[in-house]
Amino acid sequence: MLREAGFESISTETLLSSRQNPAVLPARPFMITFDDGASGLWRYADPLLKQYGFRGVAFTITGRVDTHYPYYLTWDELTALQETGRWDIESHTHQGHDRIPSGGDRQTPFLINLIQRPDGRLETQQEARERVAADADQAINQLTSHGLPQPRLFAYPFSAESNPTNNPEFAVASRKILAQRYPLLMINVDTPRWASSGDLTAGLVPRIEVTKQTTARALFDRIVAALPAPQMETRPASR
């Protein structure tokens, strides 16, 4: 459906370049992203991308590569994906795709909350900043030390960029730490919309979440509905 309707998948490089030069974008650009680094990317997604002439972005939890096999990719498989020329390997934290104790019985996202220590003390903002920075640096180091390009995109685990948090000030600080390392950060949004020049300037790009319950037709309709008005006319035949 997407190819027939004139959509073209783009790379990290094209997305980043479009901030200064929108003319690098095709008429109907979109980006296909996958989170976590599950082995299904190699087994199922890559053959389909090859078949349809699309490319993908793998947001990888580097601390889980080569673990719990066969669920997560190995480093060899991740490298093989990169070498196809169809994939960009990007960051989804090192060990930060977890929920942490943040007070009472709450378990909340690692990146935007202060951890409650076993003695009941909440970590300080400085401790939390150091924790987030160390995780971000380790994710980058893991990818580059395995011969992969330095990541330039980051997808928030759970799409938790500002909520739920036990310290809004720290959530803002955490975003700044990530933005110092990655030119663009990504989150899922409930209402599909096209990424705007304002989003790219702000460094926070919206995504449409796709689950196993999402049909091809439903996804296509959501993408088309998010298009700027002049582009909403062309649709492929129903199937």
Task: Please state what every model-predicted region is.
Residues 16-17, 36-40, 63-67, 94-99, ...:
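Solvent-exposed loop/turn segments at secondary-structure junctions
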Residues 14, 27-29, 33, 41-45:
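Membrane-embedded segments
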Residues 44-48, 77, 173:
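A short acidic, amphipathic alpha-helical/loop segment
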Residues 35-36, 57:
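Conserved beta-strand->loop/alpha-helix structural units within folded catalytic cores of enzymes
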Residues 1-29, 192, 203-207, 211-212, ...:
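N-terminal pre-catalytic segment of deacetylase/amide-hydrolase enzymes
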Residues 1-4, 37-39, 71-76:
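Aromatic- and glycine-enriched glycan-recognition loops and surfaces
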Residues 26-30, 50-162, 205:
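Metal-dependent polysaccharide deacetylase catalytic core of the NodB/CE4 family, i.e.
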